[in-house]
Amino acid sequence: MIEIEKVCVDFTAGRGTPTRAVDDVSLHIAAGEIFGIVGTSGAGKSTLLRTLNALTRPSQGRVNVNGVEISALDGKALRQARQRIGMIFQHFNLMHTRTVAKNVAFSLKAAGWERSKIAPRVAEILTLVGLADKANCFPVQLSGGQKQRVGIARAIANHPDVLLCDEPTSALDLETSATILALLRQINAQLGITIVLITHEMNVIKSICDRVAVMSGGKVVESGEVFDVFAHPQHAFTQQLVSHTLNLTLPERLREHLPGQLLKILFIGDSAEQPVLSEVAIKFGVAVNILHGKIEYIGERALGILVVQLTAPHNPTAVAAAVEHIRQRTAQVEVIRG
């Protein structure tokens, strides 16, 4: 579906030294998947996204969409290729002097639809995004979430194969963000549209994406299935993002002053549902104190992380045996202190 091959993007201000915004990125995005690109501001993710519809041209490398090298197109051929690629934005980009229906109709007129087919398609797509009753409203009368729904309706009205989402929830509150992500998931499942989404929030990635690429300094530093990236982050930057998302930082005071051994335990799949800690308490006679933890469900797979304290003041070898038992029954054990 989408092939990004060794893409670099350089920007030059005046006669200054070029700044490399995207640095040697290669990715394959399969048809029908929801692919996320995550990174902090300035990571290059927006620039990379814009190469997929040639709003930004690569300085080096190639971008192929549906078997066509879109990075090499211009004129009529580029306009035709872009009709198969919808895009939504952080700040909606609606025409404020036109109604909701006319905002959506505009994209169909621009694509050359017959006049008689535009109104039925507008009604159909507004029903899909839950705005059938807002067709004659103006953007100023809408909430932020409703405005983004108009943006989505406009982007998918022309039956695109690909939908590009540029920080689609960053201007919205948490509850509204969840409804927009649910709508995107519905569109992907119902229409089979490939979605490429960029965000700075790992929670968005966790909620909606099948696979993810992590960007830092213009490079993709890690990519893979979302569950695997959360469960086994390899790059230090990814580890930082995941740790911040799961919020498992232990206060330094506890790390320094609590007796016994401190462990961070990763549970995956079935192991997240087993009474491993109860087993070690009974079998080895150690005291188990849960200091921090949570179980997340990514897709339908459980990912549990616990920070625990193990103590056995009169039997130090019991703690070592308990740790070894936990290692055998869980995905990963990290000794924080002890």
Swiss-Prot record:
Matches recorded under SMART domains: AAA (SM00382), NIL (SM00930)
InterPro entries according to UniProt: AAA+_ATPase, ABC_transporter-like_ATP-bd, ABC_transporter-like_CS, ACT-like_dom_sf, MetN_ABC, MetN_ABC_transporter-like, NIL_domain, P-loop_NTPase
An example Gene Ontology CC term for this record: plasma membrane
Gene3D superfamilies documented for this protein: 3.30.70.260, P-loop containing nucleotide triphosphate hydrolases
Segment forming the signal sequence: none
Record's subcellular location: Cell inner membrane
Reactions that this protein is recorded to catalyse: L-methionine(out) + ATP + H2O = L-methionine(in) + ADP + phosphate + H(+); D-methionine(out) + ATP + H2O = D-methionine(in) + ADP + phosphate + H(+)
Chain positions recorded as ATP binding sites: 39-46
Keyword Cell membrane found: yes
The keyword Membrane appears for this protein: yes
Swiss-Prot/TrEMBL keywords: Amino-acid transport, ATP-binding, Cell inner membrane, Cell membrane, Membrane, Nucleotide-binding, Translocase, Transport
Top-rank taxon, per record: Bacteria
Cited PROSITE patterns: ABC_TRANSPORTER_1 (PS00211), ABC_TRANSPORTER_2 (PS50893), METN (PS51264)
The enzyme's E.C. designation: 7.4.2.11
GO molecular function: ABC-type D-methionine transporter activity; ATP binding; ATP hydrolysis activity
The family this protein is said to belong to: Belongs to the ABC transporter superfamily. Methionine importer (TC 3.A.1.24) family.
Function: Part of the ABC transporter complex MetNIQ involved in methionine import. Responsible for energy coupling to the transport system.
Subunit note: The complex is composed of two ATP-binding proteins (MetN), two transmembrane proteins (MetI) and a solute-binding protein (MetQ).
Protein name (record): Methionine import ATP-binding protein MetN 2
Protein's organism: Salmonella typhi
Gene: metN2
